[in-house]
Regions:
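Thiamine diphosphate
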Residues: 1-124, 131, ...
Length: 191
């Protein structure tokens, strides 16, 4: 489901599939981090809820360097309501030591992966189901400054703050306002 088959084939000795045991996945990643590794743990956003206790006590309170990739964040209509990842931002924001990120495109996803791994603390990267928007990716991802938004377009009347795939929608709205009303709208990628 998470599309990691190619990664499993490329590095089978570094790939662990725990099945539908999200608590175990988080605890395994915590154990690896305690042992000096920098694990990346891929879980559907909605099913990360099952591992809330180990996320708090075994990863975040210990400030362990685990990077979580939360697939199907937001609405996931083709999978049905049980797979909508709607609550992760609200329940992760109240946990100390973690970073929550959501890329606007696949290039920024690479930057966020680098940021998560290099930050040496719990990092949560959420993204929707499906393919990216088709932007060209850098050969060498660049770590992002944590907590700093990206101003994509400057205006004077108002601003639209967006995150993830909604950044493209915000840019489209800003373009429509410019075309129809001659109004420049600021668009900010909250990241």
């Amino acid at each position: 489901g998470t599309g990691l088959d190619a990664l499993h084939k490329a590095i089978p000795e570094r790939f662990f599939d725990v099945g539908i045991a999200e608590e175990h996945a988080v605890l395994l990643a915590a154990g690896m981090a305690t042992g000096g590794k920098l694990p990346v743990c891929a879980i559907y956003s909605t099913f990360l809820q099952r591992a809330y206790d180990p996320i708090i006590h075994d990863v975040c309170l210990q400030n362990l360097p685990v990077t979580f990739c939360l697939d199907r964040a937001g609405l996931s209509p083709n999978d049905g309501p049980t797979h909508h990842g709607l609550f992760d931002i609200s329940y992760l924001r109240c946990i100390p030591n973690g970073i929550i990120m959501q890329p606007k495109d696949e290039d920024e996803l690479q930057d966020m992966m680098t940021t998560g791994i290099e930050s040496k603390c719990p990092a949560f990267i959420r993204y929707p189901r499906g393919e990216g928007v088709g932007v060209e990716r850098k050969k060498n991802p660049i770590p992002l400054e944590v907590g700093k938004a990206e101003v994509l377009r400057k205006g004077s009347l108002c601003a639209i703050w967006a995150i993830g795939d909604f950044v493209q929608i915000a840019l489209s709205i800003a373009n429509q306002f410019k075309k129809k009303y001659g109004i420049e709208i600021t668009v900010v990628n909250a990241r």
